[in-house]
């Protein structure tokens, strides 16, 4: 990924986070990160979702923290490089939303 990631400013957060909050992303208490839990019809759909996200994450060299049990996928996004939320997290969360919508 080009350029060093920078932590989002308060102004950038005010501009970028409302759309994600509107679709269920929440800020993690005590950590500069965002989180969302996804539910799918079954394990195959959950795994397909994770596969599509993984391919994009690898392409972007920006990887989620995630946990999967059967049809549930929990995702936390934060940028290690800047120890907090960056535009990379916002972009990946937006992509994740597109994938989730396409699989329901």
Swiss-Prot record:
Transmembrane segments: none annotated. Substrate binds at residues 61-63, 78-81. It holds the Pfam family Pterin_4a. GO terms for biological process: positive regulation of DNA-templated transcription; tetrahydrobiopterin biosynthetic process. It is found in: Cytoplasm; Nucleus. Gene3D superfamilies: Transcriptional coactivator/pterin dehydratase (3.30.1360.20). Mainly expressed in the liver, in pancreatic cells, and in the kidney, especially in the distal convoluted tubule, in the cortical thick ascending limb of Henle's loop and in the connecting tubule. It catalyses: (4aS,6R)-4a-hydroxy-L-erythro-5,6,7,8-tetrahydrobiopterin = (6R)-L-erythro-6,7-dihydrobiopterin + H2O. Belongs to the pterin-4-alpha-carbinolamine dehydratase family. PANTHER family: PTERIN-4-ALPHA-CARBINOLAMINE DEHYDRATASE. Involved in tetrahydrobiopterin biosynthesis. Seems to both prevent the formation of 7-pterins and accelerate the formation of quinonoid-BH2. Coactivator for HNF1A-dependent transcription. Regulates the dimerization of homeodomain protein HNF1A and enhances its transcriptional activity. Also acts as a coactivator for HNF1B-dependent transcription. HAMAP family: Pterin_4_alpha. This is Pterin-4-alpha-carbinolamine dehydratase. It comes from Mus musculus (Mouse). The gene is Pcbd1.
């Amino acid at each position: 990924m080009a350029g060093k990631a920078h932590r989002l400013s308060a102004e950038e957060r005010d501009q970028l986070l409302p759309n994600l909050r509107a679709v269920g992303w929440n800020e993690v208490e005590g950590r500069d990160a965002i989180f969302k839990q996804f539910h799918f019809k079954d394990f195959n759909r959950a795994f397909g979702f994770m596969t599509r996200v993984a391919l994009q994450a690898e392409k972007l060299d920006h990887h989620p923290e995630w946990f999967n049990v059967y049809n549930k996928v929990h995702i936390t996004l934060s940028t290690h490089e800047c120890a907090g939320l960056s535009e990379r997290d916002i972009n990946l969360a937006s992509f994740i939303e597109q994938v989730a919508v396409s699989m329901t």
